[in-house]
Amino acid sequence: MLNQFPGQLSNNVFCFPPIESETKSGKKASWIICVQVMHHNTILPITDEMFSTDVKDAVAEIFTKFFVEEGAVRISKTTRVTEGKNLGKKNATTVVHQAFKDALSKYNRHARQKRGAHTNRGMIPPMLVKHFNIIPKTFFEDETDPIVQRKRNGVRAVACQQGDGSILLYSRTEKEFLGLDNIKKELKQLYLFIDVRVYLDGELYLHHKPLQWIAGQANAKVDSSELHFYVFDCFWSDQLQMPSNKRQQLLTNIFKQKEDLIFIHQVENFSIKDEDEALRLKTQFIKEGYEGAIVRNANGPYEPGYNNYHSPHLAKLKPLLDAEFILVDYTQGKKGKDLGAILWVCELPNKKRFVVTPKHLTYADRYALFQKLTPALFKKHLYGKELTVEYAELSPKTGIPLQARAVGFREPINVLEII
């Protein structure tokens, strides 16, 4: 859960990124908000488990640090969080989780206040999809039906209004799009009628155009005025817990305020009762020339993609591709249960390498393989073999297969017999 929040952990204290501004005298000022967990008089290490289970007698403390260059650091009094919220309900929070949510709310509020002249410009990374070709059962457990939308193969973009009234349009990686004047002009008109604090989340796209062409147009400094902005979600930095179905209702109201837009569109929503309906819609969308479908948990919050966090409240449905690639090495996962579990390394004809997760091996088998497979055994039995790989798509930048999973070797090989 820690990776859901911007910032880093140091000496058992989690600090959000500095929000910088400028004093009247022209000096650089920094404001930082931090969270620590106290057990009596001891600072505890913050772990992911604390977001789901309370530690007995532990309290969380929120405090801020403020300093001007060449000046002393001023530390605020701590705000203590002694219990979570919504106890006994599905959306209950622990002490630590609630403290982080409170701190994030204050962080976003402060960032928004400073967004005018001297700021990080209020960029919040958009929510990313976790589930691929799987719709969690939890999506159907609530009274509100999940939402399905067409998946366009375009370039992700988020729009917000700056403190000076200008429009900021930025990418998934928080890079500003400098062109797209046709879209920014309409956004400026739209923001005259709506809450200026709202972020519009969508995709830059033109139907039947390849992603590489779209990316080139999106990043061009000279505006071609061909791309359109398809908005599929909205959020407020201080109301990230607002459920998806309510955000969609507000998004519909936003577009009702100005119905003569040419380059900005609200994505159509479809409610579904079960997974079969979602799959039928996916098939329909693909026939229409789209990439597939996106499924949204109707009660899911907006979870920004800080530290490349992928939200479990989104699922992507699209056809799988497959191809054979040459196996050249092996490695292990880097964190969590993947640490110590074997991963294959394949190579493209241009010598670029990428990691592939074995699809049909259990974690126990993957642990055993990594422990017992030696470089000599790998070179003798596996090096240079063709591996059949399923993947979602090729990266438009590198050509590397994304979300790659190894189905098996082209020639029958039982890797467990090698060890």
From Swiss-Prot:
Catalytic machinery residues: 151 (n6-amp-lysine intermediate)
Region described as NTD: 1-120
EC number of the protein: 6.5.1.1
SUPFAM superfamilies in alphabetical order: DNA ligase/mRNA capping enzyme, catalytic domain, Nucleic acid-binding proteins
Subcellular locations according to the entry: Virion
Residues covered by region (AD domain): 121-317
One BP annotation, GO: cell division
Region (OB domain): 318-419
GO terms, molecular function: ATP binding; DNA ligase (ATP) activity
InterPro entries: DNA_ligase_ATP-dep_cent, DNA_ligase_ATP-dep_CS, NA-bd_OB-fold, NAD_dep_DNA_ligaseB
Primary localization: virion
Gene Ontology CC terms: virion component
Catalytic reaction annotation: ATP + (deoxyribonucleotide)n-3'-hydroxyl + 5'-phospho-(deoxyribonucleotide)m = (deoxyribonucleotide)n+m + AMP + diphosphate
Signal peptide: none
Keyword line: ATP-binding, Cell cycle, Cell division, DNA damage, DNA recombination, DNA repair, DNA replication, Ligase, Nucleotide-binding, Virion
Family: Belongs to the ATP-dependent DNA ligase family.
Additional remarks: Consistent with its intracellular location, ASFV encodes its own replicative DNA polymerase and three base excision repair enzymes: a class II AP endonuclease, the repair polymerase Pol X, and an ATP-dependent DNA ligase.
UniProt comment concerning the protein's domains: The N-terminus domain (NTD) plays a critical role in DNA-binding, catalytic complex assembly and catalysis.
The protein's role, per its UniProt record: Very low-fidelity DNA ligase that seals nicks in double-stranded DNA during DNA repair. Together with the viral repair DNA polymerase X, fills the single nucleotide gaps generated by the AP endonuclease. It is not essential for viral replication and recombination. Displays a very low adenylation activity towards DNA with 3'-dideoxy- or 3'-amino-terminated nicks compared to regular nick DNA.
PANTHER family found in the cross-reference section: DNA LIGASE, LIGASE, PUTATIVE-RELATED
Protein name: DNA ligase
Organism of derivation: African swine fever virus (isolate Pig/Kenya/KEN-50/1950) (ASFV)
